[in-house]
Amino acid sequence: MTLNEIAKKLIRQNKGRYLILSLSICFAILMTGAYGVLLFSPAITDVLMTDGSTYLIALGMYGITVLGIVVFLFYANSIFMKFQMGEIGIFLSLGMPPKAVTKMHNKQFDLVFTFSGVIGVVLSIPFAFAVWSFLTLFLSYTDHTFTIGWQGIFIAILIWISAWGILRLKNTISLSKADVIKILHSSSENE
């Protein structure tokens, strides 16, 4: 059995982990983008004065939400890496150098992060429209129709790329210091 066959078998066996990480990334980018699309929409910025206190409070809430989403992404990545250490330990025990294991892991991580981020950005506009439609059922505000706040999409893409780069670097550093004994010891510890 070659290393590629072992890697494919481990991915199939642990596809739930990849799915959870993918859904976490997609959810984080979707929420950031949808909130930004609504907040920076001309339908909102025309009603709320951009220098007014209500708009500044809304921007502050958006900033806190983005901070929470970044923390959520770090947490999801740490849980994913904790469970990936078993696979990484298998490859290290087979004699693969840590650099090769890191390269293989980064390839998988890049694929998951790219796929999930694109889906999150694409779905943020329909999700923002659904929220807008739901809100207009209860509010009598009908002067404007739904418009896209492109700054929100830009911020979501910026957070997506920044989080990808930081998490990839964090994972690379932790994998380059990986040791089979530490991995075996950490697998017996509880979270």
Predicted features along the sequence, with ranges:
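Membrane transport/envelope proteins' first extracytoplasmic loop
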Residues: 1-70
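Transmembrane helix boundary and interhelical loop/hinge segments in multi-pass membrane proteins
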Residues: 74-90
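Short alpha-helical segment immediately N-terminal to, or the first helix within
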Residues: 90-91, 104, 143
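Small-residue-rich transmembrane alpha-helices
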Residues: 27-41, 75-79, 111-140, 151-177
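Conserved transmembrane alpha-helices of multi-pass membrane proteins
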Residues: 50-67, 139-166
